[in-house]
Amino acid sequence: MIKKAGVEMDLIQKIKRIEQYVVENFEELDMDDPEEGYWEEYQEIPGASQKEIEAFEKKFSIKLPKDFKELYSYKNGSKYFSILPSTIHDVEMSFSLMSLEQIVKTKQYFQNRDALLTEFPDFFTEEEIEKMRDSRIKPYLFHKQWIPFAEYCDSCFLMLDFDPDKEGKEGQILCYIHDPDEVIYAAAGLSEFVDEIIQTID
């Protein structure tokens, strides 16, 4: 566990540290000034109730990771405040946390079906598919068992993976990147993903 001033930080303390960093470094992160209103709006966002989290799990027939439930008990989404400034495969993306309600709506049109990469021969050659191969991720472009929970520019998403490949782990974080479309491994889980952000900013 990462320490700050000799004291171990839990997940929510780390999130609060990231909040502080984003507010202080929005220009460097190429973001709008949080003082324009969306920081105040973010501060007022409540956490999801246990009942809401359980209903979400039931809807998708999943068991959410403990750290994911902990984060959503703190904040049920972040609206326009980019709470997860990340670098994935050398690409900088500042993700906003989607609310449980947003996730449900998004799943109606995105990651709402199973489609392998091989089903898109006009977009991916056999060589490209082989190059994208990752033994932790099943070779889909769209998969019902992927749950998008954070978004960047309405086109890139962080997703929880509930159907990993043989060397993957349930609950691992994947990133769907648009144009060109690809799905890449981001972290072993939410806690690890947040830890990587903390290590970058501290």
Write out the residue ranges for each language-model feature.
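A surface-exposed partner-binding patch
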Residues: I2-E151
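Intrinsic-disorder/low-complexity regions
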Residues: M9, H89, L160-P164, P180, ...
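Low-complexity, glycine/alanine/valine/leucine- and proline-rich hydrophobic stretches
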Residues: C156-K169, L174-I177
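Long, compositionally biased interface segments
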Residues: I184-D202
